[in-house]
Amino acid sequence: MSDTEDLAALNDRLMAKNHALAEALSRAGKELTKAKSQLAQLAQPPLTFATMVKVDSTRTDEDGIQHASAEVISGTRRMVVPVASNVNAARLTAGATVMLNEKLVLVEQRDADTVGQIRSVKQVLDDGRLIVTDASGNPVLIRRSGALAYAGINQGDRIIIDPSVRLAIEALPAEGDKDLVLEETPDVTFADIGGLDSEIGRIRDAVQLPFQHRALFERYDLKPPKGVLLYGPPGNGKTMIAKAVANALCEGGYDSNGDGAISPAETHVKGVFLSVKGPELLNKYVGESERLIRLIFQRARERAADGNPVVVFIDEMDSLLRTRGSGVSSDVETTIVPQFLSELDGVESLDNVMVIGASNRVDMIDPAVLRPGRLDVKIRVGRPKTNQAIAIVDHYLTDDLPLEDGVDAHALSAVLVHDIYGTSERRHLCDVQEENGQWHALFLADVVSGAMLKNIVDRAKTRAVKESIETGLDVALTVPLLAAAVEDEYRETRDSMADVDPEQWSRINGMDPIRRIRTAE
């Protein structure tokens, strides 16, 4: 190979290496640029969140450049900071979230924060400022944000405040009636309740008559009762009666203007049923339970303003309105009871509003609540007698169920009830010692309730269903099947008596105080 050819080959190799080096250099340059960009991004100082209070000053120079400053709150610091020229100061609103750079210059505005502490409005001042209460009940005076400048805010409303506790930044929707008002009308009617004809008659007289015959009540200068108390041992229909009242109220047809006649328009006037569970109103924060009571009666007054009858039903009333100074709970009742009483018969009228309470322990309710003029009508819903028990069982043992040929459902009900109410040894639960030291026998009939009667029938039906599954045929409800259900209920009740506290058990079940219980073998 000649020298010329050698030089040409060397030149080709060098050119190839040169291209490779150039490509490597180009890649290295790109990687270096990328690294510098990442380094610059990582070296960028952080921005600080702050809450906008107001624009402090603003002007525009001869070159059209904006010079503005704004008052902001960052954490606990209240500052006046410059506003960057590219941020329109006219669009800065109180309560909005703004960003500050490392030199504390306002460089960006964002939407107001949607989270924060929730406070209740205690008072709205004439100038629009708000007095709110914190978790301990202490009042704090705050201003409104721009978004709430013209918003209608009332006492008791809930708002979100900024971290500095200086600005109200958002109003929350009012706690809806869905927590207090039955969204659906209960399907229980008075016809569905057996064995309580006397009690039903009394509560219908107290609740329905004043609204259906308003003119007659005015003619006789008779004021409707403010409240009704349903009390007695558990499981005997107090809540069912309240549901039936709700159903009857929602049927409509009330004399709303007191002219003594129900016009076609008034047939559409329907009552409102506010259902409240007593324990739900108890709150560990000072003043919160009282606020909820005020809210309930405020809702009731609003609904009753158009002449609609309103019933406020408070279940487990003894848990909410306990005797003050009784020492059986915290001191929360010392403020809850006066608040309830002030709402019931205070300065503000409660026209068209009636309170119905239900309790197993009437002895624990403050006497001031029970006096005439407050809960005027007191209805004891006691344990059913034999005839009442048969009427109750008739609602669950009907002729459309699988029965033996020639067997009447009412006759089965009578047999079932007579078995339950027997006083032989086979229905003996235990012996109890009263406070005077005397012992006497306690039978299943002494603790029977409407709920227990339904449970016994359900036991028999469950046995029939299981036997029907095994045999593939409809098994009739027979006397032996019902007797077995009674026996199961008796055994469970007898066994549970060994673990109860005698005094508490006797009070809850509406009996005379019991010192000791001696269970049957």
Swiss-Prot record:
GO molecular function, one term: ATP hydrolysis activity
Source species, domain of life: Bacteria
Keywords: ATP-binding, Coiled coil, Nucleotide-binding
GO BP, one annotated term: modification-dependent protein catabolic process
Transmembrane segments: none
Binding site for ATP: 235-240
Gene3D superfamilies, sorted: 1.10.8.60, Nucleic acid-binding proteins, P-loop containing nucleotide triphosphate hydrolases
Entry GO terms, CC: proteasome complex
Coiled coil stretches, renumbered: 4-44
Quaternary structure (record): Homohexamer. Assembles into a hexameric ring structure.
Family per similarity comment: Belongs to the AAA ATPase family.
Name of the protein: AAA ATPase forming ring-shaped complexes
The organism of origin for this protein: Bifidobacterium longum (strain DJO10A)
